[in-house]
């Protein structure tokens, strides 16, 4: 039961951050917890998600990384925000190496948010490297260098990542449901996007 309790605590934290993310950046025009309610509903109807997975921790880091990326919007001193954003990207990529691919998207969005400068780029690079530097120190001290090499070796093994045949029917059903929700949300965002502020439209286009 310990892993389930930890898993539910992580889900509760993610739900709280979803509410704060919306309230902080006005992604939805009103203060709402609908996104958290839908998230909890999906978790509830999927018994397999009640256990603790690596992806739970990575998802929390992903959400915090988005928060700091959004905070960097049109900031003249954005190096600190991008440092923290890429720190959580780097930390998450240790557990899920393919997470590193998001770094490219994050840099493109930082450029679109007018927060990418040579200084902030160096801050982002240092933020991504810091978790690996800490991992290297641990691996070197305990003579377990394979632990440091493992994320880089797994980074290129993405063959099974897109293999839908290994998914169970309930997993495919959830993916289909999420796809429908994405299409409906995207159409609504395009149709009603002119009513939002420029900053909000930039956030929604990223999401």
Spans of features found by a protein language model:
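Juxtamembrane membrane-water interface segments that cap and precede transmembrane helices
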Residues: 1, 149-172
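Membrane-embedded helix bundles of polyisoprenyl
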Residues: 32-47, 56-64, 85
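Membrane-interface alpha helices of multi-pass inner-membrane proteins
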Residues: 81-97
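Perimembrane helix-loop-helix junctions
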Residues: 102-126
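Transmembrane-helix motifs of polytopic, lipid-linked glycan transferases
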Residues: 5-25
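Membrane-interface transmembrane helices that cradle and orient dolichyl/undecaprenyl
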Residues: 65-80
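Membrane-interface helix-loop-helix junctions at transmembrane boundaries of multi-pass membrane enzymes
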Residues: 185-206
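Membrane-lumen/periplasm interface segments of specific transmembrane helices
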Residues: 121-156
